[in-house]
C-alpha cells in the first residue's frame, strides 16, 4: 500500500486518529509502513487492547504516551508525537472510570490534544 502525503505548510500539524481494535493484530499487517508513510506529527490510537510491556512499538523521532486498561484485552489509548508536550494527563480524574485506559491528554504550547476511546452505548 502506498499513500501519497504532501504537507502544504510547515507550520501546520498533521493529526491521525485510528481505532486499531487491537494493536497486536494491526502491528503485523503493515502498521509500521503506514505509520512511516503518513509522517504525522501526532498519532492517536484507540482500543489498543494492550497491557504494559506486551508490545514494543517505537518509531524514530516519536515519543509515545500510553494509557492501559487494568482489564486484559480491553480498551486502551496511546499517542505518538514528534513534539514534546508541556504535560501529560492519563484519565479524566474519576476513579470509577480511569482504570479503563480511555483517555490520554497532551498539553502542548498552543492547544490540548485529547485521545479518547468511548463506549458504544
Model-assigned labels for residue ranges:
Residues 49, 55-121:
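Structured beta-strand-rich core segments of catalytic domains in phosphoester-bond hydrolases
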Residues 2-59, 69, 74:
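N-terminal, active-site-proximal structural segment of metallo-dependent hydrolase catalytic domains
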